[in-house]
Amino acid sequence: MPSIVRNHGPHNKILLSALLLALFGWVPLASAAVAVPMDSTGPYRTVSHPENAPSGVDAGVGPSEWTHAYANPAHNAAFPVPDDAPEWIRNGVSWLFPEARAWPLANPPFGSKTYGAAEASVTQTQFYGNALGPSVVDGVVYAESDDMFAYAVNAKTGKLIWRASPVGNNLMGNPLVIGNTVYLSAGSVAFNFANVLRYAHNPSASARGLNVSFNGIYALNRSNGKLLWYFATPGETMATPAYDNNTLFIADGAGNAFGINATTGKQVWKTHVGGMDNMSSVTAYRHNIYFAMAIKPYLYCLNESNGHIVWKGTIPGASNTGIGDVSPAAADGVVVLDATTKPQANKKAMFSNVIRAFDAKTGAVLWTRNMGSGGKIPAFKGGVPMIHNNIVYVGNPVASTYQAYELKTGKLLWTWHVPTKVAAGAGRSAPTYYKGLLYITTGQYIFVVNPATGKELHQHHIGGQFGIESPVIVGGTVYLTNSWDWIMAIPLKTISHGS
């Protein structure tokens, strides 16, 4: 990529880069390389093994692009393959890939003796391993990790193609893969003391991740992981962007939403709505985008082209962080969101999870349901919904249940109680529907549930811990990541037959 400035020495390039970053949130690679050199022999260098990339028919396995967190607006990451697909993907493959900070799957959370198992597990989930599941495109598994690396791994062999760490920050999203580019989102759950004081003074003007690290979107070369451009955001961008019409859409921890040119990394529009986006990934649907903000607890619908607010809605009584955690799902003209609500007055710390459906075009409330109550849960306050065939499948972490609702009417179809051997707070991840079965990752297990009745059919123990990582199913293989910093492939028949 050519520099946008003439060569007047490195000092002037550094100053111009700083000015561009401050004014526009964008730095061209030529200038960025001068200001931030990368040690070619250091531990955070980009490592590339092109010989491990898939070739031939193997390079066409799976979807050809990945545009959203959980694959698509409906959050169902399931991809059948044709009968003439390679045998390995039809029958399933099995491998384990340890990421940079891989922790033994049989071990309790790091630091359990000091912090206690519950607190250590939350800390490991937020700072150590994978926050979301992988993306699978054209025979390659892509993953972001809190270990500060992004990975590209051969979907058949489990061998590393490249590993890159473009910034010293947590990478908590689903990599988007479009054309020859991989897009990462960088941001941490952390607050520095200035952020805490800002919240104490004026909660509605608070910002998460401000001045904590270099937040924003990083575009990498899909073939080798090299940095192409960086778009800076003031607040954290833990959530995953959405892609549509050559534009990336992201919301940050400082109350902003952005439209970004996916080719150049330049800002198309910016809208400040206030509040904080935690892990609420953007959904692009029918020329609008949808995301939720905490503190000022609203679900927003913005016009894709200009960022103008079309409508906003809320969930009554949503907790401070709850409504900004969950990614909205959209299908058949309906947008669905849920959140943990504040405890009722004079009640003993009992929380509820509430789900609400909105008309995607107008924001009119279609229905609202209380999913059930339970004790206070740590961290992520809600369950990520998934929509398939006019049914919403969604978890409730305060009650450790999953439920199915009719999309248009909100009629409750069934409730499945996660087994008690799974840690409290189960029910955060989006289920995956594939060939008449529902696959759910929670605790140390992946479960198979009948989507018509809610009856548990099988369970498969994996170890480690699943938070909001959902299964990605391609043909006969389930691809997973987890908080213990592993990428893995498991044959579908191993899980669906029980073990």
From Swiss-Prot:
EC number: 3.12.1.-
Activity's dependence on pH: Optimum pH is 3.0.
A GO molecular-function descriptor: hydrolase activity
Keyword Membrane on entry: yes
Keywords assigned by UniProt, alphabetized: Cell membrane, Hydrolase, Membrane, Signal
Reaction it catalyzes: tetrathionate + H2O = sulfur + thiosulfate + sulfate + H(+)
Record note on temperature dependence: Optimum temperature is 60 degrees Celsius.
Gene3D superfamilies xref list: YVTN repeat-like/Quinoprotein amine dehydrogenase
Domain of life from the UniProt record: Bacteria
Primary localisation category: membrane
One Pfam family matching this protein: PQQ_2
UniProt GO cellular component terms: plasma membrane
Signal peptide range: 1-32
Summary of subunit composition and partner proteins: Homodimer.
Family to which this protein belongs: Belongs to the tetrathionate hydrolase family.
Full protein name: Tetrathionate hydrolase
Species this chain originates from: Acidithiobacillus ferrooxidans (strain ATCC 23270 / DSM 14882 / CIP 104768 / NCIMB 8455)
